[in-house]
Structures are given as C-alpha cells and as structure tokens.
Amino acid sequence: MNTKETTSTQKLAIAGVLTAAAVAGSLISVPVVGSKCAPVQHMVNVFAAVMLGPWWGIGIAFCASLIRNLLGIGSLLAFPGSMVGALCCGLVFRLTRKLSLTCVAEALGTGILGGLAAYPVAKLLMGLAPAGFTVYMIPFFISTFTGSVLAFILLRVFEKSQVFLAARR
C-alpha cells in the first residue's frame, strides 16, 4: 500500500468516526424555534475542517444529516445548516490555518448563510410556512455558536497534548 492510499484510508476512517460522532451527538439537542439545535454537528464541522479539509467536511455533514433523517432523529433543515457551515469553516481553515477564525466561520456560515438557506428548504420541501426569511438564523446561530466554542476548547486542549499533531499535517 503506498502513502497516498494510506492517507486516503486514514482520512476515510477519521471521516467515519466524525460522522458517527455527529449522528450520536444529535441525540443531544435542544428544540429552539421549531428546529433541533444540535451543537455536536458544528463541533464536528470544525474538527473536520482542521483534520480533513472543506470537501471532507461537507461530505461528513451530508452523511450525518442523511443518517439522522433516515433514523428519524433529524429534519431536512440539517442539510443546509451543517453543509454550509462545513464549507465555510473548511475554506477559512485552509486559507488561514487559524482555529479562532475557523470557529467564527462555522458560526457565521451556519448561523447566517445556513439559516438563510434553510428557509427555502422549509417552505418548498417541508411544506412549512416560516414567519420570515431570517427565522432560522437565531436557532442555527445558538447551536453553531455552542458547537464552535466546544470545538475551540477541545482542539486547544488536544493541541497542547499533541493529540491532533499528525492529523493536522
């Protein structure tokens, strides 16, 4: 097995673990303004950005959202929130390599862009009549802010203990 295959296998294994963590973590949720706010998904988005990059992060967010929906423990609103946030924080980490900016990008990407993207999903795919275009921004922001703070704290602790040293290369 060559190095490229080993790296791909390692990334796939990490993606599987992060997807499982996001699905299991979705059981820890708080209902806020008609949506399930699960901060663990947003923590996973930041972990994926740091360890794997934006495209893997989007894939993890999609798979976790799909699995949660198939298990009946999620809603279609999980897709725009988690995937937009994963893209934003993944791109910011790739460009800056700064954890603080990555966490801010996750919070703003999910809270604002994901919240806005959730409106047409709710209206067109779920048949809901949301009160306004920005109705999902506050609950999404509450969830993503909490998850981003958790990710920041945990990654700083892991960084000091050198847990993610090999994964960040």
Region locations from a protein language model:
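Loop-helix junctions at membrane interfaces
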Residues: 1-169
